């Protein structure tokens, strides 16, 4: 009789131990589900905050690109690295409203800045008599947003272009 009782207790203990494992697995799964839900909520909040800032910065300009300066100056050679480290690019306005947003930064700081003009650009804003490679092989925009050939060795306002792909 004791042998049957001990066997029963052993089986009950094994069953309870397995039950605890299952409870532990369920608890772990529930914890993971809760953590994923928190991450999803935090991601949605972060995305909303980012888009709010983006929309506020581009409000009234009609541009989906942001043009931001750190108020420093640089030669063209160092500009790509500066912008890249910040997650941006050298400005390359493709539309009039983008050039206007770029111009707003230049006008606010009363300084010129470098930009990149692609070979197949649909939009350009060259000043009269430009481009003129005698002035240099780089391109700068003045405080009115007009483009000029320029020396790549000029220290111009650092402006980087940022855009979002959603």
UniProtKB/Swiss-Prot annotation:
**Domain (C-type lectin): residue spans on this chain:** 46-161
Give this protein's Gene Ontology molecular function annotations: carbohydrate binding; phospholipase A2 inhibitor activity
CC per GO annotation = extracellular region
List, alphabetically, the PROSITE patterns matched.
C_TYPE_LECTIN_1, C_TYPE_LECTIN_2
Would the keyword Nucleotidyltransferase turn up in this protein's UniProt record?
no
Domain of life where this protein originates? Eukaryota
The disulfide bonds in this chain are 83-160, 138-152
Keyword DNA repair listed: no
Q: In which tissues is it expressed?
A: Expressed by the liver.
Residue positions with a glycan: 122
* Keywords, ordered alphabetically: Disulfide bond, Glycoprotein, Lectin, Phospholipase A2 inhibitor, Secreted, Signal
| UniProt subcellular location | Secreted
Q: How is it modified after translation?
A: N-glycosylated.
User: Which residue positions does the secretion signal occupy?
Assistant: 1-19
Its biological function?
A: This phospholipase A2 inhibitor neutralizes the activity of basic PLA2 myotoxins of its own and related venoms. The inhibitory profile shows specificity towards group II PLA2, either belonging to the catalytically-active (D49) or -inactive (K49) subtypes.
The entry's family comment says: Belongs to the alpha-type phospholipase A2 inhibitor family.
Q: How does it assemble?
A: Homotrimer; non-covalently linked.
Q: What protein am I looking at?
A: Phospholipase A2 inhibitor anMIP
């Amino acid at each position: 009789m004791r042998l049957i009782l001990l066997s029963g207790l052993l089986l009950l203990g094994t069953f309870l131990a397995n039950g605890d494992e299952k409870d532990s697995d369920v608890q772990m799964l529930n914890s993971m589900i809760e953590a994923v839900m928190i991450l999803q909520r935090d991601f949605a909040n972060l995305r909303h905050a980012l888009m709010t800032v983006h929309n506020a910065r581009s409000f009234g300009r009609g541009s989906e690109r942001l043009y931001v300066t750190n108020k420093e100056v640089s030669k063209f050679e160092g500009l790509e690295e500066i912008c890249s480290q910040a997650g941006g690019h050298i400005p390359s306005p493709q539309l009039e409203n983008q050039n206007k947003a770029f111009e707003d930064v230049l006008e606010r700081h009363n300084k010129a800045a470098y930009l990149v003009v692609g070979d197949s650009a649909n939009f350009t804003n060259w000043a009269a008599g430009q481009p003129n490679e005698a002035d240099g092989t780089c391109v700068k925009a003045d405080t009115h947003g007009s483009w000029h050939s320029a020396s790549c060795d000029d220290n111009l306002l650092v402006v980087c272009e940022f855009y979002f792909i959603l």
